[in-house]
Amino acid sequence: MSENKASDFVVIKAIDNGVNVIGLTRGSDTRFHHSEKLDKGEVIIAQFTEHTSAIKVRGDAVIQTSFGEIQSEAKK
């Protein structure tokens, strides 16, 4: 059986200034519960918990997870 992934960590590194990282809650009402703004080169390590079901990244950033790495892009 697979292990509990509720405590997985995500590393997010801003490529440009103004990257928004937003934590979304679990439950019948999905809400924002935390927001951070990163400048170029800043890194945040986020964790999925019993309260955090999703993390939204807006802007140019590299996102590393246990599943691999992906790069987000800013709107053009």
UniProtKB/Swiss-Prot annotation:
Record carries keyword Transcription regulation: yes
Family: Belongs to the MtrB family.
Annotated GO biological process: DNA-templated transcription termination; regulation of DNA-templated transcription
Function, as annotated: Required for transcription attenuation control in the Trp operon. This trans-acting factor seems to recognize a 10 bases nucleotide sequence in the Trp leader transcript causing transcription termination. Binds the leader RNA only in presence of L-tryptophan.
Subunit and partners: Oligomer of 11 identical subunits arranged in doughnut-like structure.
Record-given protein name: Transcription attenuation protein MtrB
Entry keywords, A to Z: RNA-binding, Transcription, Transcription regulation
Keyword Amino-acid biosynthesis: no
GO MF, any single term: RNA binding
Organism of origin: Bacillus pumilus
